[in-house]
Amino acid sequence: MESFIIEGGHRLSGTIAPQGAKNEALEVICATLLTSEEVIIRNVPDILDVNNLIKLLQDIGVKVKKLAPNEFSFQADEVNLDYLESSDFVKKCSSLRGSVLMIGPLLGRFGKATIAKPGGDKIGRRRLDTHFLGFKNLGAHFGRVEDRDVYEIQADKLVGTYMLLDEASVTGTANIIMAAVFAEGTTTIYNAACEPYIQQLCMMLNAMGAKISGIASNLITIEGVKELHGADHRILPDMIEVGSFIGIAAMIGDGVRIKDVSVPNLGLILDTFRRLGVQIIEDGDDLLIPRQDHYVIDSFIDGTIMTISDAPWPGLTPDLISVLLVVATQAQGSVLFHQKMFESRLFFVDKLIDMGAQIILCDPHRAVVVGHDNAKKLRAGRMSSPDIRAGIALLIAALTAQGTSRIDNIAQIDRGYENIEGRLNALGAKIQRAEVC
């Protein structure tokens, strides 16, 4: 098992650029299954979840070529559908949540798919009902295979229809869109997710010959087509990594520039950090985070405690609540964090409390942070990363802490962050990757 050994207290300075967006990468890579022609994808993040998905596509016969660092060519002209029946496929899907995004393309193009229980972060009940109901609305039917613990989904013909999603699921919306591009007639999806990841997927599919309108809204219309062709697509910068770097720069930075962040696609991220008192200077498509020894949390107009909560896009992404919470531990003032979309992502705060943070965990969804105003530094400690986002939050805490910390189970961090120790060490951090028993 690998761990990070972090020597805290070192100021970071310099320039850093975000990787490609993980969530978009998983979607658009799966979308290459929709055509037999070559699809080129650029700015692909070199992270565990994406690399495992690429290997899984290769296993089912997709031809993958690495054209350059972070650039790949995909051609799905000889897909081996028999591999879906193998125990190896089920095993790999069970360790990779992104594998669920293969269902829509396989169903749309080939009329069949296998649904194995996907893996990923253990952060509460992440239902697949939205996916199932969407496929059923298009005319698919399901059957459970007990001895393999999977569902098989088939459709002789997909037919477009109107559907109102029970939740604005990002992966559910993406999956339904990818299946519906080949459905006969018109598909209308209301209460669709509209994150930049979905927008990018729709724009790539349109470049491949799909007919999708309503992009960037929660009402998406898809006119079915007979086939799609190749395309050349570039993945957006990862907004979650941008937010993570803002948090690091605010707490332990000595002047950090974050390059090429795609400001128009950051939504409420910048404003939310500013509500915590963090100074952010926008310079074109770059962000400059100056050194800030003190930052003061805003309060509401009536003087009540600031509340920060997540919401479906264009609300604040839930993936940054963990980072924002760590930043608040050294701010001046108090703030209530309300994690509405997942019910166990705040449980990692026990580790921050052990490090000296003043946090009251009200329930699985809410935590109050009373900031130290940098008067009392966090203490170093040993901890384990429960998921990707808590992992990076704990890494930020360890960078600011006095002494040397150890974070175990860093494979969780590797799932979402590319060479994070090397990139932060280039700014002055002291992070060592070590093999431990």
What is each of the regions a protein language model found here?
Residues M1-C437:
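Short, structured segments at the rim of ligand-binding sites
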